Structure formats: C-alpha cells, structure tokens
A protein has these predicted regions:
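Hydrophobic pocket/interface hotspot
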Residues: 33-38, 44, 80, 117-119, ...
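Extracytoplasmic/secreted proteins, especially bacterial periplasmic and envelope-associated proteins
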Residues: 33, 43-46, 141, 145-148, ...
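Acidic surface patches and DE-rich sequence motifs
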Residues: 14, 70, 109
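A generic structural signal for beta-strand entry/edge sites
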Residues: 18-20, 61-63, 86-88, 112-116
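Glycine-rich portal/gate segments that line the openings of hydrophobic small-molecule binding cavities
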Residues: 26, 46, 55-101, 124, ...
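Hydrophobic ligand-binding cavity/cleft-lining segments
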Residues: 3-59
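Beta-strand/loop substructures that line and gate deep hydrophobic ligand-binding cavities in soluble
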Residues: 94-148
Length: 160
C-alpha cells in the first residue's frame, strides 16, 4: 500500500513563486470532516508521526499559538490563522531562522467521501543564515516536507 499511496502524492514547484512548493493528495474522508479533524491540533501527533507532543498555548477564534515537539527534539512554535469558509488551515513558524508558512485546503474530491488536499509551503532563508543555506537546499527541504506531510495525511485517513 505504501508504494501506491506514495504514487498518489503529487509535489511540484509553484508557477507563481520559486520559494513555494505545492502538492496534492486525495484522502478517503468527507472534506468537512477532514478539515475538522486537522483543526484539532492535539491530533497532529497521531496524523504526523514526526510530532511527539502538541501544546496549544493560545486559541482565539480561528487563530491559535501551538508548540510542536518533534521526535528529534526540535521544538517548533507555530501561529495558525485558519479560514473555515474555505476549509483552509494556514500557519507560520514564528521561531525559526527562516521565513516559513504553509497552507492546506480541503476540497471535496471527485468521488463521494473523498477530499483533495492541496498544500503550499513557502520557505525562504534570509540574513546570515542565507549565506550558508542554498536555495536548492531549501527547495529540497520544502519538497520533502510537502511529500511527507501529504503522505502522512493520506495514511492517517486511510486508517480512520
């Protein structure tokens, strides 16, 4: 199943901005239910295996501040600003050395009971760090992240 699931994940560079990588996957879930599931930040450690712990530090309306502790010990502070009417989850990393934001949109699939998840990840390194990290390296990391997260979403919803 892993091989066919991986084949269903499409990852490509944005036509609009060389700092954005996009991707698509179809998951087995109603789009509203899938969006609501991913909005539950506590479930991110079950959806994304590289996340060990989730701490919601603030939640107000469609905005939230969340800290993810990854299995490698890396801590990520994230600001969410979601758009429920568009079934869009948008978030930015607030503590890194790079400017990083991502969005996931949950669109009803062609077949009943499916959802197409479209994601965009922007990452750009500025300042002194930019002298040591090439654009190609950042592009590779973006591509790996988009592919991995879409695969994780697909695997999670295949089981639930």
């Amino acid at each position: 199943m892993a091989a066919s699931a991986a084949a269903d994940v499409s990852v490509y560079e944005s036509h609009d901005d060389h700092s954005i990588t996009e991707g698509d996957v179809v998951i087995v879930a109603d789009s509203d239910a899938a969006y609501d599931t991913v909005l539950d930040y506590a479930k991110w450690s079950a959806i994304f295996p590289d996340i060990k712990q989730v701490t919601v530090t603030k939640k107000q309306g469609d905005d939230a501040r969340v800290t993810f502790l990854h299995v490698d010990g890396n801590k990520e502070n994230v600001h969410f600003h979601n758009t429920p009417a568009a079934r869009m989850i948008w978030f930015e990393d607030t503590g890194g050395r790079a400017e990083v934001w991502a969005e996931m949109v949950f669109v009803p699939g062609e077949k009943s009971g499916t959802t197409r998840v479209h994601t965009r990840v922007y990452a750009s390194v500025h300042g002194v760090t930019g002298l040591f990290v090439s654009d190609d390296k950042v592009k590779t990391l973006r591509t790996q992240r988009v592919r991995s997260e879409l695969h994780d979403l697909q695997a999670y919803f295949a089981k639930h």
